[in-house]
A protein has these predicted regions:
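Acidic, glycine-rich loop-and-beta core segments that form the ion-binding/anion-interacting portion
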Residues: 54-100
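Glycine-rich anion-binding loops of enzyme active sites
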Residues: 1-74
Length: 180
């Protein structure tokens, strides 16, 4: 666990400055635990991203998802009935097993976003978490602005079409739930 957290810190250019282990006997079954973390950052006032300069014609740049991340796992568990699912099952759509695919580490976007900010005037950033595209993108937009996305241009990890097919989930619901 610590090695994985340390690798995440390296990818983000962050320091792991503390931590604690809360022992809660009787709360979790044996061999189970809960892990939570957060980051805090600082930025020069002149470099704060301010969407007030956003205007019609600005480009929307989508960074590709590495998979389900932490969004929609309740729905994933329901679709595959995870308690009874064979996580070692191979699906033609996936490059690995279902379990390997679902455990794909969440991509850390810090370095690509910072590199982009060196090249262009970034006017807004939206992380696609719970609520998917439909709730998160509007929060990043300036008043009176809308984003038009060409869904066919988005590179979607194969787990998402598989979830949609197996779960019989309408496409709008997929974009409202997952970070596709």
């Amino acid at each position: 666990i610590v090695a994985g957290v340390a690798e995440g810190c390296v990818q983000a250019g962050a320091a792991l400055v503390g931590g604690e282990t809360a022992e809660m006997p009787g709360f979790y079954p044996e061999q189970e635990y809960d892990l939570a973390g957060f980051t805090v950052g600082v930025v020069e006032k002149s470099k704060i991203i301010d969407n007030t300069k956003m205007q019609a014609g600005d480009a929307v740049i989508a960074l590709p998802s590495s998979g389900v991340h932490s969004n929609g796992f309740s729905l994933v568990r329901k679709i595959f009935n995870v308690e009874y699912a064979d996580i070692w099952q191979h699906y033609d759509e996936l490059s690995g097993t279902l379990g390997e695919t679902l455990l794909t580490p969440t991509k850390i976007y810090v370095k690509p976003v910072l590199a982009l900010m060196e090249q262009v005037d970034v006017r807004a950033v939206s992380h696609i978490t719970g609520g998917g595209f439909y709730e998160n993108i509007p929060r990043a937009l300036a008043a009176g602005c809308v984003a038009k996305l060409e869904k066919k241009s988005l590179r979607m990890p194969p787990i998402f079409p598989l979830l949609q097919k197996v779960g019989k989930i309408p496409r709008p619901d997929m974009f409202n739930t997952f970070n596709m």
